[in-house]
Each structure stands twice: as C-alpha cells, then as structure tokens.
Amino acid sequence: MTSDRFLNEYIEKKLLKPEKIGLDQIEKVIKSTEKDLKVAEKLLSIDEGHSYDTAYTAMLHAGRAFVFIKGFRPTTNFQHKTVVAITAHFLGDKYKVLIEKFDYMRKNRNNFIYEPWKINISMTDAKSALKSAQEFVKIIKDEIQREHPQINFKF
C-alpha cells in the first residue's frame, strides 16, 4: 500500500489528522524521550513494572515525534495503536521485529495500567523493554535527522 493511501485511510477513520508541528516542538518531544530512558533505567532497581512502563513511554514519545515529522497528529481515538501502525508502515520490514516489540509493550503497558492483576513484569522483561526503547529512540532520531539534514537538532 502506498504511503498516501495508508495515511488517507487513517485520516478517513479519524485516527490521524494533518497538522504542522514545529521542529522545535518535535525536538522537545525527542528530548523528553532521553529523560524517559534515564528514568526507566533508574527505576530498574526500584520497580520493574514502572521501569517497563517508562521505557514504553519513551517509545511512544519517539513514535509521536516521528508521526509529527510526517506532518500529522494522532487524534484522541486509539492514539497509541495509531502511532505503532504509522511507525510500522514508514520504517518497514527492516524494523519489523522492533515494531512488533513496541506493539507487544503497548499491550502489556495497557494491562499494567488498567488490569495490573493480569500481568507480572519481571526484571528480564524490564531490561529487555529498556533495550528496545533505547534502540527505537535512536532509530527515530536518525530518521528525523535524515528527513531534515539541514537542521542541527540538539538531541
């Protein structure tokens, strides 16, 4: 499916809307991912579940920045799922396994927040989530820089 057709489907379903987001705002969102990653790392020694949740939040923020750089904003319906779908479409098969992990973490995070009795996040899970988040944030930063090589981002 072409990118235009894919994006139009999401717009028609009211899951996405065109919106120009300033590069300065995108840079701030990316900078927030760095804080999220640091917090997730520190939380490992305190609470695995919250570390996992914060690592996922870093991925979500990076994914949102990626959607913003494309000129769109997720609407109020299914924002997290939409961000995963948009990043999957544009990053393609090269990062398929990482995007699948992002989606898996999205589902686990949902259970952790809304039905915590259904999930037990281990130290191994939390460390794996942090590693995936670090990798994902780096990829998104590289993609944003690649799309705007003329900008000297400070992230």
Model-derived features with residue positions:
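Terminal alpha-helical segments
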Residues: 1-155
